[in-house]
Amino acid sequence: MTPEEADFFLSSYRFDLPPEQIAQFPPEERGASRLLVMPREGAADPRSELRHAAFGDLPDLLPPDALIVANNSRVLQARLLGLRATGGKVEFLLLTPLPLVMERAAPDKASGADAFRAEAEGLVRCGGSVREGETLAFGAGIRVTVLESGPFGKRRVRLAWRGDLGKAFAATGHIPLPPYIKRADGEEDGSRYQTIYARDDKSGSVAAPTAGLHFTPAMREKLEARGFEWAEVTLYVGYGTFSPVRGEDIRGHRMHREYVEVPEATAEAVARARARGRPVAAVGTTSVRALEGVAELCGRVQPYTGWTDIFLYPGRSFRVVDAILTNFHLPESSLLMLVSAFAGRERTLAAYAEAVARGYRFFSYGDAMLIK
């Protein structure tokens, strides 16, 4: 089998990672992370080309005059703990981005002047099976009625609430930490599992755009002083980001959909950068998916509001992004395949092996990697 043929096999994306290198907590100080720098192109074994740096060195390491594009979505306290009518415990995770829920919201006049309802999608977990038509009760007056069962625990539901739904989730919900973080969410996660530039009106992600967690106000100021332009997109990170690729031939994988917003100012910034030959540096795979997804749908980056299900794996081309700042990803994950599409599978896995050997911290609260 040639390396090119191996690119399409799920088992080609395995690597060994000691459990103790999966970061369970953020670093003591935001931005106090390590940064592994790898050229996008080069030998199959990139170890001699790697640079081991600190995230604080980022302004010296980014491509000069780059346009930086980041995802400004905010993680919603989307995990609710409540009770069934039988008294049994139940957990609900809202999967539909909050702005879409609000677009669908209709007054529930039978329940009062400030009562609303809307259909949405979510995950329901409990000790037994949940019946269609069953209503579940949660804090802050949120009620969830199961309308239809779907695959992998998904449910179509009707939400009912009073007043401001975002405030209700904030009052009673929990931060939905990834499954590889083996602890309950704590008070610290409310701030540390959000980027400093996450917008209140962009709440609805069920996972953080984790490459952005390293940025501090001081780093933003330093980048601005060095002349880097900053632009933002919104991609509401869905729970599908943790969904495994199930088939051995990855070309048959169907990617989850995520809701994207590219504002006019960002589309114009990308167009200016491309016209002037300036590189575009994406903060995280979610920003990559937003930019490349819109470019695939529209032929270029333009103002857009809608869904993307783009799946980037080796052999797929990149139309927009020239550099990626990203965390380290799970074995056999679609995000590892995206990075491999950008820098080559063998190079990426060799860099990961070096990161493991040197004790880098992995996944959401872990260290970062810059590929340029």
Annotated model-derived regions:
Residues M1-K372:
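A cross-family signal for N-terminal binding/gating loops and helix N-caps
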